[in-house]
């Protein structure tokens, strides 16, 4: 089995459906003997360019280990899900379990926002 990193972009109106989508894709991989090593929900982010007249979308990154048949089925599921605007599948040499640089940035932003709200609350 090979290791893959998958990033998919979900329509912003479907953001509340993302946890269910992640579970569906995880169960698809595990039911066929694969493994899910890392799941990162990067949240709503500004896109580099507009897709379908949208400037923001919900980003998700998943690292998996699976066979070619499972990967083909997963790609088929992405193509026929209208909520998925784009997807990218990259083969990796080994399983990635540490937080990605993007996830570290998301965590920094959340920590900064939390610190900002506490300082505003103390000032009031």
UniProtKB/Swiss-Prot annotation:
- What Pfam families does UniProt report for this protein, alphabetically? Ribosomal_S6 (PF01250)
Keyword set for this entry?
A: Ribonucleoprotein, Ribosomal protein, RNA-binding, rRNA-binding
GO annotation, cellular component aspect: cytosolic small ribosomal subunit
Region Disordered, as annotated, extends over 96-124
Q: Which GO terms describe its molecular function?
A: small ribosomal subunit rRNA binding; structural constituent of ribosome
Q: Where would one find coiled-coil regions in this protein?
A: none
Q: Which GO terms describe its biological process?
A: translation
Q: Does the keyword Ribosomal protein apply?
A: yes
Q: Where is the composition biased (Polar residues)?
A: 115-124
Q: What does this protein do?
A: Binds together with bS18 to 16S ribosomal RNA.
Q: Which family does it belong to?
A: Belongs to the bacterial ribosomal protein bS6 family.
Which protein, by its recorded name, is this?
Answer: Small ribosomal subunit protein bS6
Can you name the source organism? Cupriavidus pinatubonensis (strain JMP 134 / LMG 1197) (Cupriavidus necator (strain JMP 134))
């Amino acid at each position: 089995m090979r290791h893959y990193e998958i990033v998919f972009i979900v329509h912003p109106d479907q953001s509340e459906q993302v946890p269910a989508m992640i579970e569906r894709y995880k169960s698809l991989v595990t039911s066929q003997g694969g493994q899910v090593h890392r799941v990162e929900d990067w949240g709503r982010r500004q896109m580099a360019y507009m897709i379908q007249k949208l400037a923001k979308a919900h980003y998700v990154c998943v690292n998996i280990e699976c066979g070619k048949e499972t990967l083909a089925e997963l790609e088929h599921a992405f193509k026929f899900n209208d909520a998925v605007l784009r997807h990218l599948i990259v083969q990796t040499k080994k399983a990635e379990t540490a937080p990605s640089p993007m996830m570290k940035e998301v965590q920094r932003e959340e920590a900064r926002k939390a610190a900002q709200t506490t300082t505003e609350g103390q000032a009031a």
